[in-house]
């Protein structure tokens, strides 16, 4: 289901990503949720939710990287 606010995000996202990365995750998830509503638009047998989470993480990884300190940092 789409997320209305950052506070609605899963704990595994809220506790590891900085605020801006959470915004990216939320927007990408919501967009993918709409885009991949039809099963034939998804790869493999992934559910709509699984697909949306994969897209959201890919969007975050496009702008952020996990550092040696195990924290997410904006790429320069």
UniProtKB/Swiss-Prot annotation:
Keywords: Transcription, Transcription regulation
Keyword Transcription tagged: yes
InterPro entries documented for this protein: ChaB, ChaB_sf
Entry-linked SUPFAM superfamilies: ChaB-like
Domain of life: Bacteria
Subunit composition and interactions: Monomer.
Described purpose of this protein according to its UniProt entry: Might be a regulator of the sodium-potassium/proton antiporter ChaA.
NCBIfam families noted in UniProt: PRK09582.1
Annotated family: Belongs to the ChaB family.
Protein name: Putative cation transport regulator ChaB
This protein's encoding gene: chaB
């Amino acid at each position: 289901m789409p997320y209305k606010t950052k506070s609605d995000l899963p704990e595994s996202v809220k506790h590891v990503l900085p605020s801006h990365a959470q915004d990216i995750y939320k927007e990408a998830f919501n967009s993918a949720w709409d885009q991949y509503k039809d099963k034939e638009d998804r790869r493999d047998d992934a559910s709509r939710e699984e697909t949306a989470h994969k897209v959201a993480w890919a969007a975050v990884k496009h702008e952020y990287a996990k550092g040696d300190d195990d924290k997410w940092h904006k790429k320069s």
